[in-house]
Amino acid sequence: KQCLVGSEMCIRDRNISKWRRPAPNTIPWDAKAAGLYMICTLSKHEAEQQGYSESLMLDFEGNVAEGTSANIFFKDKNNELHTPTPDSFLNGITRQAVIELAKSKNIKVHERKISPDELGNFDGCFLTGTAAEITPVASIADHKYKICDVILGLSKSFDQLVRQKKAA
C-alpha cells in the first residue's frame, strides 16, 4: 500500500508491531545483529499479512523505537522534530545526517522517549535509512500525517548532500 506524491514516495499504512525491540542488556542493539533482523522481519511480515506496508517497532518499555528497517521522526505543529532516543536500536548514519541537516536549518530536534499515545500529537512523520533515505509516512494506525514543507525540504537537502558526496 504505497502511494506517490509528486516524486516523493510515502508509506500509506503502518501498524504497531506486537514484537518489541529487546532490552539493551540482552543483545548488542547498537550493531547490525542477525537476531535483531529476525524481530524486524517477523514484524514486517505480520504487517503485510494485515494489509499494511510497514510496522512501527516499540522498545522493551513500550515506547516508539523505529520502523522495521529505518529510524523514525515526527514533526509537531511548531515545526520541531521528535525522534526516539537511540537506546535500543541502531543510531543510523542517515538519522544522524538528518539531525545535523535539521539543526543547520534551525529546526529543533528533540531526542526523547515517545509514547505510542503521543502519535496523534504530531502532524508529520518520516523514516530515515540507507534504503529509505527520507520517506514520508502517511499514517500509523488511525493517525494521519501530512507531507509538509519541513519534510520535503529535509528530503531535498539530504538528496543534494548525497549527490554531492557521490560526485566527489
Predicted regions and their residues:
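Surface-exposed charge patches
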Residues: 2, 45, 96-100
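Short, conserved active-site entrance elements at the starts or edges of catalytic domains
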Residues: 15-65, 101, 108
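Structured loop/turn residues at beta-strand edges in well-structured enzyme cores
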Residues: 5, 50, 120
